[in-house]
Amino acid sequence: MQRIIYYLLNKFFMTEAEGEILKYFKKKDKIVFDIGCFRGNFTKNFIKNEKKLGIKSNFFLFDPNPNVKNYLKLILENTQIKYFNLALDNSNSKKKFYFNTFFEASGSSLNTVIRDDKKWKSTRKIFMQIFQPFKKIGDFAEINVQTQTLDDFCLDEKIENIDVLKMDTEGSELNILKG
């Protein structure tokens, strides 16, 4: 059942439109950040479209959930991709990180509000009605993760410009940009 849910989510909510932005780039060596990379679908689509156009970028993938690396094994063989088990945020510190135990990485966030949010509770209720046997669908685990600001990360890695910045961090996007 879990694979069917993943298939449906990817089929109807993930598109290859991300790669279309490449048509607007003239620069060959781009820096692409995939923050909240989960399974790396954005990066996979981007690379596929790059090959069609004869372009090659350097990718930096970020996700603080330790389970994510298991999903990225194949794309991490690509030398133009670097993965960081790190949460980008507005400070350099340790913070609590929440992830959905049913989907392992999907819906993970530094955003503590997510567990108490009315929208989340409403969505969870609908999921529970549809997938009654899977009572853990809305349970969250909590771990402590290292956070770093985007500015400090770029200084450490000697990155002057980010050409493409994709973020899917379940509500922490503004904090990342502030950092």
PLM feature spans:
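Phosphate/nucleotide-binding beta-alpha loop and adjacent structural elements of enzyme active sites
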Residues: M1-G179
